[in-house]
């Protein structure tokens, strides 16, 4: 099953050699969906269902009192949807501001990419990945494998949330104590998954350069690979240009 997931993912990673194309297409897809909603039309795609909650979130708060609350998948979806809606609100506001300043729509759109539409698109992507992963896991019969996959899903969700805790802290959507709980739960999940990681990596088989583990090469030649990296580094066997500074000179 994991192999099928990987094969399906690999061909969708880039488009025309540039991920920014996908980011901009995603932003346009979401804003078009919002326009339909604001006109009272039906939102055509289920992946945009979070737009039904697009509103002023200034008074909204999430209740996280203990670490087990962070294992609640519905709560994680709620938080990821909140983040996407908040970033969408900021993006729409920024876009409207640029247009009011007599910038053309094209220039206003480009000026709203960094920190706004790009962040919103990535947030939507992570929400979409979370929901797809969850729906697939729910089809699996209860087993140790399912438990591990759920832990990975929760870890993914919390890691995504942790990157934007400053955003979640706006208007006290989450408390400072909840931020500590998020970080602690990430550490607990990493500890719990430690014994399963070798099996997981064997199944997914990411390329060594993607994994980035200095001692975790897939061919098993740990020290040979490490030395090859050193020996192949540019200038490895050349005398450094500052050698004379350290060279002992006769007086």
Language-model features: where?
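Flavin-dependent oxidoreductase catalytic core characteristic
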Residues: 1-251
């Amino acid at each position: 099953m994991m192999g099928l997931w990987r094969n399906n993912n690999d061909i969708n990673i880039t488009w025309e050699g540039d991920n920014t194309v996908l980011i901009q297409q995603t932003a346009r897809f979401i804003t078009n969906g919002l326009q339909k909603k604001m006109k009272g039309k039906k939102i055509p795609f289920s992946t945009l269902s979070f737009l039904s909650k697009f509103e002023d979130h200034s008074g909204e708060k999430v209740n996280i009192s203990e670490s087990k609350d962070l294992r609640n998948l519905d709560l994680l979806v709620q938080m990821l949807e909140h983040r996407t809606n908040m970033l969408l609100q900021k993006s729409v506001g920024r876009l409207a501001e640029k247009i009011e300043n007599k910038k053309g729509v094209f220039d206003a759109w480009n000026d709203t990419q960094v920190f706004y539409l790009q962040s919103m698109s990535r947030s939507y992507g992570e929400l979409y990945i979370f929901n797809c992963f969850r729906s697939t896991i729910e089809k699996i019969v209860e087993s140790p494998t399912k438990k591990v996959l759920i832990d990975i899903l929760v870890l993914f969700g919390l890691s995504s949330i942790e990157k934007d805790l400053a955003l979640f802290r706006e208007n006290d959507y989450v408390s400072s104590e909840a931020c500590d709980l998020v970080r602690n739960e990430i550490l607990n999940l990493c500890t719990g998954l430690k014994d399963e990681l070798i099996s997981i990596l064997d199944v997914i088989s990411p390329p060594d350069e993607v994994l980035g583990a200095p001692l975790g090469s897939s061919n098993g030649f740990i020290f040979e690979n490490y030395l090859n990296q050193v020996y192949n580094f540019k200038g490895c066997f050349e005398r450094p240009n500052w050698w004379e500074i350290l060279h002992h000179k006769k007086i």
